[in-house]
Amino acid sequence: MKISLSLQQDFRSPELELKRAQLKKIIETTLRHVGYKEDCEIGIACVDLEESHQLNLQYREKDKPTNVLSFPSDIPEEVLPMLDALPLGDLVICIPVVLQEALEQKKTAQNHFAHLLVHGVLHLLGYDHETSDEDAEEMEGLEIEILAKLNIANPYQE
C-alpha cells in the first residue's frame, strides 16, 4: 500500500512537531488494521482556532472550533478505475484545540494528535460515532486497538 500525504501546516506549534514519516505510519497502521490495502491519498491541514470555528460552523452548524473535521472524498464510481490512488479525503486538525485537550486530559500532544488522526482516518473510511451507541463503541474499540499497535495508551481510560 502506498500512501500519498498532503500536509498543509497553516498553524504550527513548538509543542507539537509533525513528521511526515510518523503521520504516514499512523495512517498506514489505521488502514491496515481495518483491512484497507489500496494505494490512497489523504490531505491533512493543521489550522488555527478561527479557521476551525468557521469550518465547523459552515459544515456542521456548530458555533465553536473543534479538534478534527473529516471530509471524505466524493469521487464518482466511474472515475475510480482511472485513478492510480484512491483519494480518501481531507482532515482538518485544529492545533490549539489539540494542545488544550491534551493538557486537560493529561496526555502528550503527540499522542493526542495521533488519536485524532486515527479517529479522522476512520471517519474518512465511513466509520461514524454519532449514528448510534453501537457505532460509537465499534469506532472507539478500533481506535484503542490501533493506538495500542502504536504503543499509545487507551485514550478513553481515565
From Swiss-Prot:
Look up keyword rRNA processing and say if it applies: yes
Describe how the cofactor binds: Binds 1 zinc ion.
Q: Give one GO term, molecular function aspect.
A: RNA endonuclease activity
Family stated for the protein in its record: Belongs to the endoribonuclease YbeY family.
Task: Quote the PANTHER family the UniProt record gives.
Answer: ENDORIBONUCLEASE YBEY, CHLOROPLASTIC
Q: Which domain of life is it from?
A: Bacteria
The protein, known as: Endoribonuclease YbeY
The function of this protein is: Single strand-specific metallo-endoribonuclease involved in late-stage 70S ribosome quality control and in maturation of the 3' terminus of the 16S rRNA.
Is Magnesium one of the keywords UniProt gives this record? no
| EC numbers for this chain | 3.1.-.-
Species annotation = Acinetobacter baumannii (strain AYE)
Give the gene name.
ybeY
Cellular component GO terms, alphabetical: cytoplasm
Query: Which keywords, in A-to-Z order, does the entry hold?
Result: Cytoplasm, Endonuclease, Hydrolase, Metal-binding, Nuclease, Ribosome biogenesis, rRNA processing, Zinc
The entry marks the following residues as binding Zn(2+), namely H119, H123, H129
**Major location, coarse class?**
cytoplasm
What HAMAP family would the database entry show? Endoribonucl_YbeY
List, in alphabetical order, the GO biological process terms annotated in this UniProt record.
Answer: rRNA processing
Location in or out of the cell: Cytoplasm
Tell me the cofactors it needs.
Zn(2+)
The record's SUPFAM superfamilies line, in alphabetical order, gives: Metalloproteases ('zincins'), catalytic domain (SSF55486)
